[in-house]
Structures are given as structure tokens and as C-alpha cells.
Regions:
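Canonical positions in the second alpha-helix
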Residues: 55-56, 89-94, 127-128, 162, ...
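TPR alpha-solenoid repeat register
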Residues: 66, 100, 104, 138, ...
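Canonical tetratricopeptide repeat
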Residues: 69, 103, 107, 141, ...
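Alpha-helical segment of the N-proximal tetratricopeptide repeat
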Residues: 29-62, 69-85, 89, 110, ...
Length: 348
């Protein structure tokens, strides 16, 4: 063997020894620093984590996870542009696994979203979905994006996909988007299209009350008071708390139609379904009082008080009904009771 051959052989042996003994130690050191970075992130010490991550990529430029974490921390610190630069540089690396590509696109979507570049954020999410079309995070990100952009058709479409991925049904969410779409059409003067959209919403979820509020309002504009009343009543029955806000609308529409007697029947239906609805109950008592049925009105209020002694609303209604028939000392006692309740509520 010639001297040059011997020298080459020695160099090869030295190189091999370097690879098998020194390289693993270097790799072990790099992973140890990366672990320190992750621990710092868990503690919330982002500055230390960032320092460790920078040390990692100096020692190992192929450590993609470290680059990803660096970019994510920079974004969280408010430096989305620097995060984009790091994350974007990873997209051209060859032979990346799908889960790494998914992480890159997710990070870029969040980067762009932070600086309100929504079109680019959407593009990254769509690239992610090409790798994993059932990715729940990506679909929910798109849903939030479409809601922000008030694109109700796409929001409805994505909502259906999410429900399929989650293996659940949420007709209320679909109905909500349809109602928002209908409201947009109404604002643009497309009344008939709005009504059709609201009707679809009602079929999608018959218990989503806002549909009927919108239908009632739109039929009022069309002066179709019969349909307006029907839909408002559905709203009031489904949403007793907010339904009281439209009692005056229903009364006015019934009076316009000359259907005075139906005001009493309307409040009776509300009270029958929800006996604790004091707003409807006092309205009904007022109607009975106006008809001269004083005793029936008083009996109605007293029945409500037997179930809820602390209702100031009911006590005031009883006081109103008692003014002309009760003795002064009885009225005084009743007023004292109301003052006591008011004082007690204020002290709480």
C-alpha cells in the first residue's frame, strides 16, 4: 500500500470516528438545549425559550421544530412579520412530513391573521386542508374568518363540515347563519329573498326564536299584519325574557286589525306556557281591568304573588288594582311591603 493510500485510509477512519462519537454528542447537546427551550415555554418564560431555540438552530440548521417554535413565540410577542419570515422559509424545505407541513401552514395562517392579511391566512388554511381535509382546527379557523367577513353562505357550508367531523348536529348554528344571511338581504331591499331565507331557517331549526322575530318585522314592513303577529307570537313563546319587548308591537297590530279581543287571548297563551312570566301576567291583568273585570285581574296578580312573594312588579300591580277598593291602612301596609323589598334588593 502506498503512502498516499495509507494517508487517505487514516483520514477516512478519523472521519468515521468523528461521525460516530462526536456527532451523537453534539446532537444530544442540541436536543438537551431544545428540551430546555420547551421547559421555558411551559413556564411562560418566552425570552429564555427564544434564546435556547436560537442556540439550537445555530448548532443544527435542520431542526425544523425549533424554527417553528421560534416563529410562534415571535408572533405571540407581537412580531408577526418576523414570524412569517421564519415560517415561510420552512415551506421550501424538501422531504418534510405531512404533520410538519400542517404545523407550518397553521403557524403561517396565525401569523397573517395577526396582521389582518385575511386572504393570505385563508390561503394557508386551505393548503393545510389539502393535506388533512378533516382538520378541525383549520375548519374552525375558516368558520371564524367567514363570520368576520360576514360571508354567511361559506359559514353555513363550513359549519356543516365541522359538524360532520365532530359527528354531531347543531341545527341552531345553521339557522343562525341563515337568519344573518336573511337580514343582509333585507337590508339590501331584497325582501322576498329574505323571507325565503328566513323560511329555510325556520325549517332547519323550528326552535331558533330569532327567525320569527325577523319574519314578524319583515311582514310588518309588507303590512301583512296577520303573518307579523303569528311570527311575533312564536318568538314571544320561545323567548319569554326578550319576548316582552314586542308585546306592544303585537297589541298595536291586533288593534290595527280590529281584533281587540285577541289581546287577552294572546297574553293568556303566554301565561299558560310560562306562569312565572310576570310581564305577560301584568299585561293580562291590565286588559282584564280595562274590561271591568277587576276581581279577575286582582285574583290573577294575587295568584302570582302566592308563587313569588318577592316580585316588586307583581306587588306594584296589586297596589294599582287595590287603590280604589282597599282601605288606607291596607294600602299603607302594602306600600311598606314594597319599600321593604326595594330596600332589601338595594342592600344586596
Amino acid at each position: 500500500m502506498t503512502w498516499p493510500s495509507i494517508i487517505i485510509l487514516i483520514l477516512v477512519i478519523i472521519g468515521g470516528l468523528t461521525f460516530f462519537y462526536i456527532q451523537p454528542k453534539q446532537q444530544a447537546k442540541t436536543e438537551s438545549i431544545y428540551t430546555d427551550a420547551l421547559n421555558a415555554m411551559v413556564r411562560g418564560d418566552k425570552r429564555t425559550a427564544l434564546k435556547h431555540l436560537r442556540d439550537v438552530v445555530k448548532q443544527d440548521t435542520n431542526h425544523v421544530d425549533a424554527y417553528l417554535q421560534m416563529g410562534d413565540i415571535l408572533r405571540e410577542e407581537g412580531n408577526a412579520l418576523a414570524a412569517i419570515k421564519i415560517h415561510q422559509s420552512l415551506t421550501v424545505r424538501p422531504n418534510l412530513k405531512n404533520d410538519v407541513k400542517i404545523h407550518i401552514h397553521r403557524s403561517l395562517a396565525l401569523d397573517y391573521n395577526q396582521i389582518s392579511q385575511l386572504a393570505k391566512a385563508r390561503r394557508e388554511v386551505e393548503l393545510l386542508l389539502k393535506l388533512d381535509k378533516k382538520n378541525l382546527w383549520a375548519n374552525e379557523f375558516l368558520l371564524a374568518l367567514f363570520e368576520k367577513q360576514q360571508d354567511w353562505d361559506k359559514a353555513t357550508q363550513i359549519s356543516k363540515i365541522i359538524q360532520k367531523v365532530k359527528q354531531l348536529q347543531d341545527p341552531t348554528q345553521i339557522a343562525r347563519f341563515l337568519v344573518l344571511k336573511g337580514m343582509d338581504k333585507h337590508e339590501k331591499g331584497k325582501v322576498d329573498e329574505a323571507i325565503k331565507t328566513f323560511d329555510i331557517a325556520a325549517k332547519t331549526d323550528p326552535n331558533y326564536e330569532k327567525t320569527y322575530l325577523c319574519l314578524g318585522d319583515i311582514y310588518l314592513v309588507k303590512r301583512d299584519l296577520v303573518k307579523a303577529i303569528d311570527n311575533w307570537e312564536k318568538y314571544a313563546l320561545l323567548n319569554p325574557e326578550n319576548g316582552k319587548m314586542i308585546y306592544s308591537k303585537i297589541e298595536a297590530a291586533l288593534f290595527d286589525l280590529g281584533r281587540f279581543s285577541e289581546v287577552e287571548k294572546f297574553y293568556e297563551r303566554i301565561v299558560d306556557k310560562d306562569p312565572s312570566n310576570l310581564s305577560a301576567l301584568t299585561k293580562l291583568a291590565n286588559v282584564l281591568e280595562e274590561k271591568g273585570e277587576h276581581n279577575s285581574a286582582l285574583s290573577l296578580v294575587e295568584d302570582a304573588l302566592s308563587k313569588n312573594q318577592t316580585s316588586i312588579h307583581a306587588h306594584l300591580m296589586k297596589l294599582k288594582l287595590s287603590v280604589q277598593v282597599s282601605k288606607p291602612n291596607e294600602l299603607s301596609n302594602h306600600i311598606d311591603k314594597i319599600i321593604q323589598l326595594l330596600t332589601s334588593n338595594n342592600e344586596k
